[in-house]
């Protein structure tokens, strides 16, 4: 997959939990300034990490169950998930280089 995938609460298990590669899950909202800043960064990273990490986004305004399950209180919150388990969390936007380093450290 070379582009960011938008998911919802109903898709979570099939897309994230059952994934055979790590997932970078971005919890975001359309009104969130830092979320808007990180969106193009995620779009750039998706093809660079194709086959190694799947980048997915979930709108917290439209989906409350999954963010609540993970205790998301601030956005953007990025979770790196491997084999259905959270292995790293990043709250807040990062520049592309730092976000790529965050991913590489945990995959």
UniProtKB/Swiss-Prot annotation:
UniProt key word GTP-binding: no
Coiled-coil intervals, chain numbering: none
A GO cellular-component term linked to this record: cytoplasm
Domain Thioredoxin: 2-107
An individual GO BP term: cell redox homeostasis
Disulfide bonds: 32-35
GO MF term list: protein-disulfide reductase activity
Keyword Transmembrane helix included in the entry's annotation: no
Stored PROSITE patterns: THIOREDOXIN_1 (PS00194), THIOREDOXIN_2 (PS51352)
Pfam families tied to this protein: Thioredoxin (PF00085)
UniProt keyword annotations, A-Z: Disulfide bond, Electron transport, Redox-active center, Transport
NCBIfam families cross-referenced by the UniProt entry: thioredoxin
Family (UniProt): Belongs to the thioredoxin family.
Role according to the record: Participates in various redox reactions through the reversible oxidation of its active center dithiol to a disulfide and catalyzes dithiol-disulfide exchange reactions.
Name of the protein in its database record: Thioredoxin
Species for this entry: Haemophilus influenzae (strain ATCC 51907 / DSM 11121 / KW20 / Rd)
Native organism taxonomy: Bacteria, Pseudomonadati, Pseudomonadota, Gammaproteobacteria, Pasteurellales
């Amino acid at each position: 997959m070379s582009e960011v995938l938008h998911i919802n609460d109903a898709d979570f298990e099939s897309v994230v939990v059952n994934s055979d590669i790590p997932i970078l899950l971005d919890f975001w909202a359309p009104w969130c300034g830092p979320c808007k800043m990180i969106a193009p960064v995620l779009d750039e990273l998706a093809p660079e990490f194709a086959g190694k990490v799947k980048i997915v986004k979930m709108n917290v305004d439209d989906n409350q169950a999954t963010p609540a399950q993970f205790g998301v209180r601030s956005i953007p919150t990025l979770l790196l998930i491997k084999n259905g388990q959270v292995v790293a969390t990043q709250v807040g936007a990062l520049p592309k280089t730092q976000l790529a380093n965050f991913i590489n450290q945990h995959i």
